A protein has these predicted regions:
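Basic, Lys/Arg-enriched alpha-helical interface segments
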Residues: 1-60, 66-120
């Protein structure tokens, strides 16, 4: 494959991923942010069970928090090409997000998360 063809293919994939993330953020999640299949459960630890994630295409995950009382969704992180979903990998999307949470960012409470997001 020529370099130009590889670049075009990579750009096409990025466009496809971006389009899917946009649709997820503005259509799928807002339609039903508390869906059972979006719940993480104990995947990244019991202390992080309030977090949600939605699968985008096969290897991308969009992580968010949702507060049903205020009806606010805060999107926090989506993995990139360096942290694709790969079970057991140190760079797996879930492992990477858990490390972020363990490091204190994003904040663990919804109130702090909302405050931080408003400051950005």
């Amino acid at each position: 494959m020529q370099v130009a063809e590889q670049t075009t293919t990579k750009n096409d994939l990025r466009k496809k991923v971006l389009k899917a993330i946009k649709r997820t953020m503005f259509e799928s999640v807002p339609a039903s942010p508390g869906r059972a299949e979006h719940r993480l459960g104990h995947t990244i630890g019991r202390e992080n069970s309030a977090w949600f994630r939605v699968k985008v295409l096969q290897q991308y995950r969009l992580f968010y928090r949702y507060d049903s009382a205020s009806k606010i969704i805060v999107y926090v992180w989506v993995n990139d090409e360096d942290s694709l979903r790969a079970y057991g990998s140190k760079t797996d999307a879930y492992a990477t997000f858990k490390k972020m949470l363990d490091g204190g960012y994003p904040p663990s409470t919804f109130e702090e998360l909302l405050k931080t997001s408003r400051e950005l």
